[in-house]
Amino acid sequence: MLSKFKYCPICGSSLFNISSEKSRKCEDCGFEYFVNPSSANVAFILNNNGELLVERRKNNPAMGTLDLPGGFADMNETVEEGLKREVMEETGLEVTEATYMFSKPNTYHYSGVDIPTLDMFFRCKVKDDNKVKANDDAAEC
C-alpha cells in the first residue's frame, strides 16, 4: 500500500520515502505516515433453526459472492456500534446482543489498493430474524 503514496500529504515533497514496512517519512518536513489496519466487523447471526445468515454482495469488490453481514467502523464509532449499524443497513435486523469471538488480520482490495484490515467477529442475537431484508451492500440475504 505504501507504494501508492509518492508525495508527502503535509508539504507535498517528493522526498516521501519508505522508512519501515508500515511507514513513509518526509525528508523535508519530518512527517511520518503509518499504515495501520482499518477496523472491520463481521456478524455471525443464527436463526432459531441454527441456520447462518449470509448475504450476496451487491457491489465490488467480490460482487455476487456470499458474505457475512458487517463492514467498517466509521469515525467516532465503536466496533460494536459499527456492527449494529452495518447489520441494520444490510439486513434490516436490529442487533440486541453482540458477543466478541475472535479477530483476524485481512486485506480489503478496493480501487486498486490493498487496505489492511483487522476483522473482528461477533456472535449476534437479533430482535426478529423474520424481518430480514437485503439493503445497502447486500443484493440478497
Feature-to-residue mapping (PLM):
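Conserved N-terminal beta-strand and adjoining loop/helix that marks the start
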Residues: D28-L52, F72
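Short functional micro-motifs and their immediate structural scaffolds
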Residues: F16-N17, F34
